[in-house]
């Protein structure tokens, strides 16, 4: 989860009623290209630029890869651009676009303001026409995504994952966003939605090496680190559709896999996933999952000053999904 606010503070850790517009709005070039200095820009429903919200206060982006992307901000009630804050108008942050969903009039401490909640334009994928295809055999993510997005105004972008899987969606499923979110559960990849050009990427979960460093007394204001073995597993029994096992795929013909990379303790979990009909696909996915489950999880929550807007420090810029270097000598974090 990544949160930004106007003070350039980030928050990290490891881990309504919506109207669907079948015709995507026209595009104009973004006014800003860096998040650290960007102001909010508002457009009408047809994509015509209305103005820059210079007086928008406390803008907060809350983002999590492939699942959460919302924007909240407030605006003084007497702001002359208040008239642009209409439900279903579009707010742009650099090259990311959001539909205005909720507008509240608030009186707090003698101050009148509008409090605005927005959702990324890709949220509307959950309110589209029913899908034509619900089943795929030995298909790549690109093939499945193309079928899911067909007729939505969105298209497949960059796909780095080339493995093949079988996938059967439940009959009557009309939520294409929910269908897309099945892919990370079956393949090893991450969904990235590009609201600037209405494309969806499916990338390997490796992250970009940003080159940025977060260091105490430099740009780190607060940090909280947690290490946990609450959900640690070292032995995994896997079952697919109709209680299919992985015995045909396992090199030793076993119905389970093991990984003792962190501890020799035997901690067993049984998993059944009806989406898998091929034992080799289930085995491959299980090996990957256990490589993660068999080691402690770590989460880092930090408040960080964004230095990238300062002269000579543009290399300190980072974004959601990037790899960053974290150092705190006193806490032994490196």
Model features per residue range: what roles?
Residues 1-34, 326, 333-334:
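Viral virion structural and adsorption modules
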Residues 76-159:
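Surface-exposed cap/loop segments at beta↔alpha junctions
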Residues 36, 104-125, 160-237, 242:
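Short beta-strand-centered interaction patches in the first periplasmic/extracellular domains
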Residues 30, 34-66, 217-225:
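Solvent-exposed edge beta-strands and adjacent loop segments
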Residues 84-90, 172-173, 217-219, 321:
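Glycine-centered loop/turn motifs
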Residues 87-95, 164, 321-329:
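Short conserved beta-strand and strand-loop elements enriched in small hydrophobics
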Residues 142-146, 177-180, 235-236, 283, ...:
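Extracytoplasmic/secreted envelope proteins and their assembly/folding machinery
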Residues 57-81, 222-334:
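An acidic/polar, Gly/Ser/Thr-rich interaction patch typically located in mid-to-C-terminal regions
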């Amino acid at each position: 989860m990544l949160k930004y606010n106007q003070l350039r503070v980030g928050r990290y850790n490891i881990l309504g009623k919506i109207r669907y517009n079948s015709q995507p709005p026209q595009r104009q070039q973004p006014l800003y290209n860096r998040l650290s200095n960007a102001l909010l820009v508002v457009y009408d429903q047809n994509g015509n630029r209305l103005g820059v919200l210079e007086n928008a206060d406390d803008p907060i982006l809350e983002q999590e890869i492939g699942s959460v992307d919302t924007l909240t901000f407030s605006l003084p009630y007497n702001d002359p651009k208040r008239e642009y804050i209409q439900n279903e108008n579009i707010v742009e942050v650099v090259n990311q676009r959001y539909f205005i969903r909720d507008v509240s009039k608030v009186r707090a401490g003698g101050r009148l303001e509008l409090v605005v909640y927005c959702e990324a334009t890709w949220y509307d994928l959950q309110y589209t026409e029913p899908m034509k295809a619900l089943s795929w055999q030995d298909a790549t993510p690109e093939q499945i995504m193309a079928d899911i997005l067909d007729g939505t105004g969105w298209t497949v972008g960059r796909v780095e994952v080339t493995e093949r899987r079988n996938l059967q969606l439940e009959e009557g499923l009309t939520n294409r966003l929910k269908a897309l979110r099945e892919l990370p559960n079956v393949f090893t990849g991450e969904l990235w939605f590009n609201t600037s050009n209405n494309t969806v990427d499916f990338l390997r979960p490796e992250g970009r090496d940003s080159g940025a460093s977060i260091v105490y007394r430099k740009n780190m204001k607060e940090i909280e680190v947690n290490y946990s073995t609450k959900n640690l597993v070292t032995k995994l029994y896997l079952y697919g559709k109709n209680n299919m096992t992985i015995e045909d795929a396992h090199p030793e013909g076993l119905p389970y896999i093991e990984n003792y990379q962190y501890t020799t303790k035997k901690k067993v979990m049984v998993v059944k996933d009806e989406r898998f009909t091929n034992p080799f696909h289930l085995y491959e996915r299980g090996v990957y999952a256990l490589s993660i489950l068999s080691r402690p999880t770590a989460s880092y929550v930090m408040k960080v000053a964004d230095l990238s807007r300062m002269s000579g420090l543009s290399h300190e810029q980072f974004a959601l999904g990037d790899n960053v270097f974290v150092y705190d000598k006193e806490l032994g974090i490196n």
